[in-house]
Amino acid sequence: MIKKRLFIGSSSEELKTAEIVKEVLLKDFEVTIWNDNVWDTAVFKINQNFLADLLKASLQFDFGILIGTKDDKVMFREVEMIQPRDNVLFELGLFTGRLGTSKCAFLIDKEIKLPSDFNGLTLARFDSTNEATVIAGANSIKDLFLASADDEINFFPSATLASVYYENLIVPICRFIIDNNGFTKGDTHYQKCKLNIIVPERINQDVNLQFEKLKGLFTTENVSFKYSGRPRQISVDTQIKNDTLEFIDFPTIITGINHAISNLLPNDFNKQSPDYSSILDRELRRFITTLKKLLIRGGFDEMVNVKRDSEL
């Protein structure tokens, strides 16, 4: 089973704390620590290349933990206060916006006072003089992340496309079968029906051509039917196997994943790089995961199989 990827952001002065947190999480997650060394070499603490890396990272990780420590002194209403580094707060905002509040957490020193804007975020406090409190905070965040990993649908491009595909094709087919106690094809009524959704292992540049090659592995016949409330006919390929009518669909909607990711990344990002391929692969897995969650929620999971082309 592929481990979920987790990002830890901290100041370079608190790498020891980040390493403790990483040790707690390594059993359940693939963990990467990002510290602020790169910020120290950037113009005004920020540049386009670094932002590109952060945007890329926010698409490559499933969860984020930002560690807030007593790094900077600031004056607030004529009172001296201690706050985390600006870059840590920036990363917290970026990852929370991208991943959602249930998949991003702030592990923060107990002596830091946070503004009310942080209400609603997942917070865990620790005492910088007591390692046990760091471990306890990391464990509480770990439990939250593990609990949220399989029961939420986020709105990454892949999840949005999966939701559209589910509502516009899967639901009409399944409801039509249920309402009609099967499906009539020609002179034969089939009570046993199944929908097979075939998803490729990777997304090629021309997804339509990719699916046409996959369709060559099947001997199918196209059927169409009118679904209540829809202005158009639903059209889908079918085959008969073991007295079961199998609907077969190749979701060309996944073409949108490539376009969406391209728009989310900087224009000069290398679309041929391993990092880009990694992001696409992750989104394809999210597409499948989201579909399976929606099928369970809708009660259609026993009627639908989602397969990778390698399983054919």
Curated annotation (Swiss-Prot):
Family the UniProt entry places it in: In the C-terminal section; belongs to the bacterial STING family.
Descriptive protein name: CD-NTase-associated protein 12
Residue span, TIR domain: 5-127
Keywords, sorted A to Z: Antiviral defense, Hydrolase, Nucleotide-binding
GO BP term, pick one: defense response to virus
CDD domains with a match to the protein in the record: STING_bact-like (cd22659)
Coiled-coil stretches: none
Superkingdom of origin organism: Bacteria
InterPro entries reported in the protein's UniProt record: CAP12/PCTIR_TIR_dom, Prok_STING
